[in-house]
Swiss-Prot record:
The keyword Transmembrane does not apply. It comes from Streptomyces griseus subsp. griseus (strain JCM 4626 / CBS 651.72 / NBRC 13350 / KCC S-0626 / ISP 5235). The gene is rpsG. This is Small ribosomal subunit protein uS7. Keywords: Ribonucleoprotein, Ribosomal protein, RNA-binding, rRNA-binding, tRNA-binding. Signal peptide: none annotated. It comes from the Bacteria. HAMAP family: Ribosomal_uS7_B (MF_00480_B). The lineage of its organism: Bacteria, Bacillati, Actinomycetota, Actinomycetes, Kitasatosporales. Belongs to the universal ribosomal protein uS7 family. It holds the Pfam family Ribosomal_S7.
């Protein structure tokens, strides 16, 4: 850890189209090689597709998807006397959101649809309905934490 202490958290700029910091965070996660306009086109296209498919506000669908993907527990490796234990710990709210966005974008990229816009839209739609690979990742993470509950006393 640096001597000055942790770096201060920078505020997330609110998205001009949907007036939501969540959309800005999603754009930042999609961003590759500094091509913000491309990332914005992908995200806004996916949001419009969500609006057409669901008939609801896409930000609400995004929030529902995020809630379904956010983990509440995860495991961290802890070395105790030559053995490495997977210790379950609670996930802080900021990290939960970051992990959820990371998983949504990662599993969107792994999907089979033709364009990234379609992939992201369908992954968000699946996640908001409690389906999809990103929700499965959360369930697997919780399962790992549950199966290693015996090592919870090694928390730090």
């Amino acid at each position: 850890m640096p001597r000055k202490g942790p770096a201060p958290k920078r505020p997330v700029i609110i998205d001009p189209v949907y007036s939501s910091p969540l959309v800005t965070s999603l754009i930042n996660k999609i961003l590759l090689d500094g091509k913000r306009s491309t990332a914005e086109r992908i995200v806004y296209g996916a949001m419009e597709g969500l609006r057409e498919k669901t008939g609801n506000d896409p930000v609400i669908t995004l929030k529902r998807a995020l809630e379904n993907v956010k983990p509440s527990l995860e495991v961290k490796s802890r070395r105790v006397g030559g053995a490495t234990y997977q210790v379950p710990i609670e996930v802080k709210p900021g990290r939960a959101s970051t992990l959820a966005l990371r998983w949504l974008v990662g599993y969107s990229r792994a999907r089979r649809e033709k364009t990234m816009t379609e992939r992201l839209m369908n992954e968000l739609l699946d996640a908001s309905n409690g389906l999809g690979a990103s929700v499965k990742k959360r369930e697997d993470t919780h399962k790992m934490a549950e199966s290693n509950k015996a090592f919870a006393h090694y928390r730090w």
